[in-house]
Swiss-Prot record:
The gene is eriC. It is a single-pass membrane protein. It is found in: Membrane. This is Cytochrome P450 monooxyhenase eriC. It comes from the Eukaryota. The chain crosses the membrane at residues 2-22. One of its GO terms (cellular component) is membrane. Belongs to the cytochrome P450 family. Cytochrome P450 monooxygenase; part of the gene cluster that mediates the biosynthesis of erinacines, cyathane-xylosides that show unique biological activities, including leishmanicidal activity, stimulating activity for nerve growth-factor synthesis, and agonistic activity toward the kappa opioid receptor.
Length: 511
């Protein structure tokens, strides 16, 4: 039974009663202002019923964009939300007006109940966020990220060997690649298989927190007083099963934040530590004997930044393999360039990046076509504003539809790296899709340089080392379906393929 089964009916009922007066006041005070178009909704509850009845609320957004245009307004219990689907709008609001558009919604479930309060992605904009941002910029800037290149290349080499040995387990091996990279860089912990307890913790804490938020998080964000349902509701009362679900998730979050952090500290104490985010942060603050409990809280949150990159890295790579199977001519062109530039006695490295322009365009198209997320985490405006004649009241959540922004180009379904070389077929897609995928303005992902290096290293070495081909069924090639799951992370539906080593570089990774 999922969390939603326990709480949807009672929490919605309580919330409806609690909000009538507030919503009516907001409706009366705002009804004469010009707002963006959007679904009309009902008095008091707004568009709640449409969102609840949808299998996944975010799947409604592309439909609303198609129906109402590039800027769409919807409400839930009087709380304003604006969905934007043009890159130019995101730049104007979230970057140029970043001083007032950099807050987050009050994420009560994630930050106050589940324990992600030190995580920058969901942190409110203020002194604590600026402190974390300063620390992350020092430890994750482009020059600092280059210091981890050897880790990317070592872990990607391990990926190649695993794929050569077990090509049918490619999902598993790509997951290990993404997870191992994160734990090496964040904590100096080497992970070689998915049976490791830390893999379970990292995957479980992030995935279960996201599921809990989709089930009920938005409601408790609107009505923080409902926290008692999560913290104090009697365990013997009806509908109390969700309490155990929440407590279990909280326990996993605590362990995911604490266990690898303590392991990294222990390696520093016994002198076996190599460079990591944790060791760099602790050293920068004066060492193990100098850091305060507040410092440690901040460092745990900083190290956990990269957890979010684990899933998006895996999604990007698995989607790109799917694209290569459907566009073999693109795969061959990228391989030909690599073979022409990189000597056959080694694999491409990040030091080669500037000399392989088609591969760079290939990676950009991978971010666009294989877009790992449907929407970005919402920004919240901290004061009233006006955009293109539309009134945007204080407290409005701005939701960037990443997927739509990256598909506003001719032949969007085609995987075509040339669009980033000659500039044709770009449409309204920015020249660098990373400007969308990694977020906007002051909320841009601080780990973007590490994440981008991880994606580039994997794709470059996969292209150099293997051919990705359709599955053979009764001697005939069968293309995998272009279908995706219904979560906000765009995992492709499980597919099968052939992964065949390229003989000219097999010696570079074979044991």
């Amino acid at each position: 039974m999922v969390l939603a089964d326990f709480i949807s009916i009672p929490t919605v009922s309580i919330a409806c009663l609690a909000v009538l007066g507030i919503a009516y006041h907001r409706h009366q005070s705002n009804k004469n202002t010009r707002r963006p178009p959007g679904p009309k909704g009902y008095p008091f509850i707004g568009n709640l019923l449409e969102l609840v009845s949808a299998e996944r609320p975010h799947l409604l957004f592309p439909l609303w964009i198609k129906q109402y245009g590039d800027i769409v307004r919807f409400t839930v219990f009087g709380v304003e939300n604006i969905l934007i689907s043009k890159f130019s709008t995101a730049i104007e609001l979230l970057e140029k007006r970043g001083a007032i558009y950099s807050d987050r919604p009050h994420m009560v479930l994630e930050n106050e109940i589940l324990g992600w309060d030190a995580a920058m992605p969901t942190m409110r904009y203020g002194a604590q966020f600026r402190k974390h941002r300063k620390l992350s910029n020092a430890l994750l800037n482009p020059n600092a990220a280059r210091g981890y290149i050897a880790i990317h290349e070592e872990v990607s080499l391990r990926l190649l060997s695993a794929l050569a040995a077990q090509p049918d387990q490619f999902y598993h091996h790509i997951l290990i690649y993404a997870t191992s990279t994160i734990f090496r860089i964040s904590y100096d912990i080497d992970i070689t298989d998915d049976k490791h307890d830390l893999v379970r913790l990292a995957n479980g804490a992030v995935r279960k927190s996201a599921e809990a938020y989709q089930a009920s998080g938005a409601l408790v964000d609107v009505f923080p007083s409902l926290k008692w349902l999560y913290n104090s509701y009697p365990t013997t009362a009806p509908f109390s099963g969700y309490r155990k679900v929440i407590e279990d998730i909280k326990g996993e979050v605590v362990q995911a934040n604490n266990i690898p952090y303590e392991m990294a500290k222990e390696k520093m104490r016994d002198g076996s530590a190599t460079r990591s985010l944790v060791s760099d942060a602790i050293t920068g603050l004066g060492g193990l004997d100098a850091i305060s409990p507040a410092d440690e809280h901040d460092i745990r949150g900083l190290a956990g930044i990269l957890y979010a990159g684990q899933e998006t890295t895996m999604v990007t790579i698995t989607n790109t393999i799917l694209a290569m199977i459907h566009h073999p001519e693109v795969q061959r062109k990228a391989q030909a360039e690599i073979d022409a530039v990189v000597p056959l006695d080694r694999l491409p490295t990040l030091d080669d990046r500037a000399n392989i322009p088609y591969l760079e365009a290939f990676v950009k198209e991978a971010y666009r076509w294989a877009c790992p997320l449907i929407i970005a985490i919402p920004h919240t405006v901290i004061q009233d504003d006006v955009y293109e004649g539309y009134f945007i009241p204080k407290g409005t959540s701005i939701i960037a539809s990443i997927y739509d922004m990256l598909n506003q180009c001719p032949n969007a379904a085609a995987f075509n790296p040339d669009r980033f070389i000659d500039g044709t077929d770009l449409g309204d897609v920015p020249p660098d899709p990373r400007d969308v995928v990694f977020g906007f303005g002051r909320r841009r992902c601080p780990g973007l340089h590490v994440a981008d290096n991880s994606v580039w290293a994997a794709l470059a070495q996969l292209l150099a080392s293997f051919e990705f081909l359709p599955e053979l069924v009764d001697g005939k090639e069968v293309l995998p379906p272009l279908k995706w799951g219904k979560e906000m992370a765009r995992h492709p539906q499980p597919y099968r393929c052939r992964i065949v080593p390229r003989e000219n570089r097999k010696h570079c990774y074979a044991a």
